[in-house]
Amino acid sequence: MRILVYGAGVQGCQLAHSLAQNKKNVVTLLARGEWKAVIDQKGLTIRHMLQRKTTVDRMQTTDVLAPEDVYDLVFVTVQAGQLADVLPILKANRSQYFIFVG
């Protein structure tokens, strides 16, 4: 399943990590700027405090959702104040299923 997680904050990163555990999923994380560069270079590092472990996931990243990009699922994990900017981008995209998290 091709999955995009739109937003690389705490929720988005945890969701991307969880979805990536199923090897049938091809997870792409939409991140921008310096944070995208860190994920590309070092992987998505999560420190799990309760489990007392650290995981590093290598996954695809992108900094844009183009209208012609098609995913089976798009999880939207942006902050409420960012939705007004994100909704036109989602509307222009050809993917059918959008799940808003948060």
Q: Which role fits each region the language model picked out?
A:
Residues 1-51:
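NAD(P)+-binding Rossmann beta1-loop-alpha1 motif at the extreme N-terminus of oxidoreductases
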Residues 53-58, 62-102:
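Rossmann-like NAD(P)(H) cofactor-binding subdomain of soluble oxidoreductases
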